[in-house]
């Protein structure tokens, strides 16, 4: 039949076949009974009730959909149901016999009971699109996975989180791919986990998440078997099972097992957010001699007026850090370009010297965070600009000794991105001000002649610097629903150190205004705040960077009265594997 009006009450007997072909939706109210078979063709939806589902033969859904629309379960007497490619069965139904979901076929579950066995080579859709978790599929017989897909909705949180569920009274076997959609869950630590699949018989089937993991807030969930009395069942757990899932998982013969005592698992994206906010506040941070080399080489006041100058510096660096109880290992590479020049120079007493200048810069950083708990990684990117002013005062311009004070302020703006395997990229911006005050005092420690007819003057320079770091990310919500709030803006970084250097002049350079000044310095650096990210309220912070030790060595050279060069390399070391290595090259031209 292909028209509803052509079918009244029917009895399919003597192994007969009733074929219903429709391109439109039918609500079948007539009785269909007997021992024969029914085949559904066409793209339309055929809705059955208890009377029209009373036949006992085989059902073949070749096209379109057979639906059960009642609030109470419809009893389908068919002893075997085959859902073919492009076929769909849906609704609140209790079947008398077996159901076979073939490749391309779909079983949509509400409150569904399979009276016999269930084979899944297509899709068993536990979750209604965008709907609340709570659908239950009960299989009174055995379940066999033929590399089919099973989808669930769950509100990812603790053990008692709402979820769709499958309850198999018999045995499980074969391989099944699993997809879990998070519906409003903010993530939490689990103990035993969120139960998705309960097995009453022999639990030999393998179930694996299609993405290896599913995320909510700062937590990563994996699918694993239970322990003890729950060893047959399958759970979503945010506890580490000691096995790192592969990037593109397949069901495995030895599935992971929930460890209630294991540590929670954090998302690698947390490391990328932390790296980005730390970079936003530190990329353009610098010291007096980073910006100007040895300013007194060629900036000394001339009798005819003040010298004008332009400077530029290039910085490359590599940072290694950890976060999330050591789970997240981040490496970051950065590049910084800054340039500027003096607007004015003057002296208040014919001995000291004042500078006022402007500067601007461009910087970028790319970071990679690898988790030692889950099988995917995260990438962070940040790029942006800065512009601002600096001012410097020297107590004694003539003999290079005495006190100095340097200050600067910058406005910084950045574009940020965090992306990870098989997950949507998250783009956001950051804005804010950084500012610094630095002071030091230079002592002449001695003068001696070198073996190569050089005259060497040894200087020692204690230094102190306070930097306020006020760049803040925009709070926002990721496409997956995770609320992102970074922490650490407003950090006050304190640096205490000492620099010692030799000013060397060779006799052959007499009258050439050429000087050479190697140096080494050591610093202690303290950060008042920890850079961190809050993901749905769960905070993950960078480790080992509150207190740092630093060593730098470099050289400052005066080529002639107009040109000077400087460069250095430095290493910072902290706790828990934190390290930062940097190289810098600067040039200044005066006229």
Question: Where do the protein language model's features map onto the residues?
Answer:
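Extracellular beta-solenoid/beta-roll
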Residues: 2-5, 13-22, 27-30, 35-41, ...
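Transmembrane beta-barrel domains of outer membrane proteins
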Residues: 49, 67, 90, 169, ...
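Flexible, glycine/charged-enriched surface loops at secondary-structure junctions
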Residues: 78, 449-454, 507-516
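Transmembrane beta-strand segments that form the barrel wall of outer-membrane beta-barrel proteins
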Residues: 108, 153, 184, 411-413, ...
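Short secondary-structure subsegments characteristic of cysteine-rich extracellular domains
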Residues: 187-203, 326-345, 484-491
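Extended hydrophobic secondary-structure segments that form protein cores and membrane-embedded regions
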Residues: 195-197, 310-311, 355-362, 405-409, ...
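Outer membrane beta-barrel translocator domains of Type V secretion systems
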Residues: 251-451, 568-570, 575-582, 588
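Outer membrane beta-barrel transmembrane domains
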Residues: 388, 470, 479-591
